[in-house]
Design a protein with these regions (language model features):
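Alpha/beta-hydrolase fold active-site loops
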Residues: 151-152, 331, 365
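Primarily recognizes the serine-hydrolase "nucleophile elbow" in alpha/beta-hydrolase
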Residues: 163-167, 204-285, 306-318, 327, ...
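Acidic catalytic loop of the alpha/beta-hydrolase fold
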Residues: 339-343, 375-376
């Protein structure tokens, strides 16, 4: 009788690499229980699925759908993205520091036999270096790829949760980009709130990044999600000469107020961004139709996008607050979700795409709109089950929308799209620099 075993192709690899998991040695038609457990920042996350072995006594997770379990349908990485925290409400997906790999233990059981294997997900490839940045008034972390370079660069900004987006920076560096994760609030030495953030701070970040890494082809892209998606479009339009490309995850087409990340003394209808010391006009300002009621009222979890949609009915306020994306002087990528619970990123992205088409934007414009997905588009092969959360600044219990399976698809497809987009953008910049 064959011994039960689990094999994992590419058991130790970057987090964005799909693994091929197979179980062999079961009896034909036998039920096989498979579990996946991963400690994440001290909290155990777990998923499980029950399969029926084929005529050869094997289970192939890419080929076979579970008959029950944490996910449905054939999906080679389903046991990772369908994980939930055990006896915890944690939403922390990564270890601290993020350079510590995520180690998943796989266990298969038939009732009479057991097998175990593991897979390791790295955010930082071998040779990637990490450097904390606390200079020129900037707060962030710089990740550099292995090798001497020069490398094209990306500056990453977070959304309304604030802080330093080290996981995304580490993965960008692992894929060949000098990646600077720049905090602008809720980080050491910075305000705990998003209100009254000067755009000149980010210009200083762009200048520091160029001076420090001397990027290949002078290429510096911006990458941001949510409020950071709004921000990178705004920065691309404001400091156009300094921005080589823009990647906006679930972005806005408009300048918004402080919202959930506001300073309570300023209020959620107060300004977020300053330029030259003056607040930028935001969509809630003197808006005749905007109402917080659809977000505030009713039971938890709340959907912030319902309030955001009320502001779109005032055409004059919309026009005043629109980000002038036509001023961007490089390629633009937009990633949105049709069931975004935080704000209507699909509607916003279409507005941006349509404006760029209207002015015949001379650079590459890509828009990936993910059906049934929610606000939390990250990168491949992380859990997508925690849809409801308390906002990290306001504490308001909300839903980001979507569902685990479609959010997992968006995670995987978006990252491949972004890597291909940036590769084209770097090549275009390099070609333009040729004599």
């Amino acid at each position: 009788m064959a011994q039960l075993s689990i094999t994992v192709d590419q058991a130790d690899a970057l987090i964005d690499v799909a693994r091929h998991i197979r179980i062999e040695g079961a009896q034909p038609g036998e039920a096989v229980e498979v579990t996946a457990e991963t400690p994440r920042s001290g909290v155990l996350w777990r998923a499980q699925a029950r399969f029926i072995a084929d005529a050869k006594g094997t289970v192939d997770l890419r080929r076979d759908a579970p008959v029950s379990g944490s996910y449905a349908g054939a999906d080679g990485m389903g046991l990772v993205w369908s994980q939930s925290p055990v006896a915890s409400t944690s939403r922390e997906l990564f270890n601290q520091p993020v350079t510590d790999a995520l180690l998943t233990t796989l266990q298969a059981s038939t009732g009479t036999a057991q097998a175990q294997a593991s897979l390791s997900q790295q955010l930082a490839a071998p040779g990637v270096t990490r450097r904390e940045v606390r200079e020129d008034g900037l707060v962030g972390t710089l990740y550099l790829p292995a090798g001497a370079g020069p490398h094209p660069a990306v500056m990453i900004v977070n959304g309304s949760g604030g802080g330093i987006n080290e996981p995304r920076a580490a993965l960008y560096a692992s894929r060949g980009y000098a990646a600077f994760a720049l905090a602008y609030f809720k980080a050491p030495g910075l305000s705990p709130y998003i209100s009254n953030t000067p755009l000149e701070y980010f210009e200083k970040g762009l200048q520091w990044l160029r001076r420090t890494v001397q990027p290949a082809h002078d290429f510096v892209a911006l990458s941001g999600q949510s409020r950071g998606g709004e921000l990178v479009l705004l920065l691309g339009a404001t400091f156009a000469q300094q921005v080589s490309a823009v990647v906006g995850y679930v972005p806005s087409a408009f300048v918004h107020s402080g919202q959930n990340a506001c300073d309570p003394q300023v209020g959620r209808e107060g300004p977020t961004w300053l330029l030259g010391g003056k607040p930028l006009t935001h969509i809630w300002e003197n808006n005749r139709t905007a109402s917080w009621a659809p977000f505030d009222e009713g039971p938890s979890p709340h959907r912030h996008e319902r309030a955001m949609r009320t502001a779109l009915r005032d055409a004059e306020a919309v026009a005043r607050a629109r980000i002038p994306v036509e001023r961007i002087q490089g390629p633009v990528m937009l990633l949105s979700a049709t069931d975004d619970g935080s704000w209507p990123s699909s509607v916003y992205s279409q507005m941006v795409r349509d404006k760029l088409a209207e002015v015949q934007h001379p650079h590459d414009v890509q828009w990936l709109d993910f059906e049934r997905a929610g606000h939390a588009i990250l990168f491949p092969y992380v859990p997508t089950t925690q849809l409801v959360y308390a906002h990290p600044v306001s504490g308001k219990v909300s839903t980001g929308g979507g569902n685990p399976a479609d959010n997992a698809h968006a995670d995987a497809a978006s990252w491949q799209g972004v890597l291909q987009f940036l590769e084209r953008a770097v090549a275009a910049k390099a070609g333009a620099a040729q004599p």
